[in-house]
Amino acid sequence: MRKILEISGASTLAEVFPKFELYMHGGVNFEPYRGQFQALFPDQNIQFRNSYNASEGFFASQHHQDEVGMQLLLNNDVFFEFMPLDQLGKSTAKVHTIEEVNLQEDYALVISSSAGLWRYLIGDTLQFTSLYPH
């Protein structure tokens, strides 16, 4: 982004992108970078939204800036199952569907997708902060 300032001769990115309103981020904790990013857009009310995506699919997005949790994308060619962490490694592990999850319980994410993944344990864990919407 600093290269854009250098090339354009602008002092802020707001001069280059005056209608910039939304920044989607994901994969890393954005908080250490928020202040630097906001300094590039002074006096603009930028909305920041987190997303949960991976090579295996796009799983969730933050719908409201003031809420920490994200909402699962349940109509995106991915079927979600949730394995309680105490079940990991068990040959008869109990796996839950979206209707069977509990709040504040840690789950390992298991996905099946139209891309050919079947009951794939991707290595991520999550907790539900809301049961509706998920």
PLM segments and residue spans:
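Active-site glycine/GP-rich loop and adjacent strand/helix microenvironment
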Residues: 1-134
